[in-house]
Amino acid sequence: LSTWLNSNNVSDSVSRLNIGLILAGNIPMVGFHDILSTMIVGHRAMIKMRTNDDVIIPELLEKLTEITPEMSDYYAVVDRLTDYQAVLATGSNNSARYFEQYFSHVPMVIRKNRTGVAILGGDESEDDLNGLMKDCFQYFGLGCRNVTKLYLPENYDLNKIFSASLP
């Protein structure tokens, strides 16, 4: 973590802010990076969990607080965001429109749906295709950066893709 902080020129003299975090809930613990990034630079993470991912992160934060009790000053798991000076929210393209309007009075970063694209040349190895299929199907394809679109050369042998997608 020190190497990461030092390589990103994070100042020790940051004014502490309450940062509202609306976490994605499509993959377990997908929002932990946002929490860690907020806390490690000295801000307080005001965490709004998604109902389908509201167990592991609170348990992890509780365990981390048992190890380092002062950590409790750097986060709060909340049902509703209040008293925040900036927001980082992740959601669908539709919810992003709502977030942009609702949080327009503070600095914000709003993440929307994203997708990954793979362009194949036709000379990929079996290992390459196995890795590609892992990326397509990891987390049941729910990750915002999972490959969801393939561009294939004309007359590509689709059996290569089908074989790589089977366990």
Where are these regions (language model features)?
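Short, solvent-exposed amphipathic alpha-helical segments in soluble enzyme
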Residues: 36-37, 104-105, 165-166
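Hydrophobic packing residues within well-ordered alpha-helices of enzyme cores
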Residues: 57-60, 99, 161
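Conserved NAD(P)+-binding/catalytic subdomain of aldehyde/semialdehyde dehydrogenases
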Residues: 18, 68-150, 154-156
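Structured N-terminal alpha/beta-domain signature
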Residues: 42, 84, 117, 161-162
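Conserved small-residue-rich beta-alpha loop and adjacent elements
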Residues: 4-65, 71
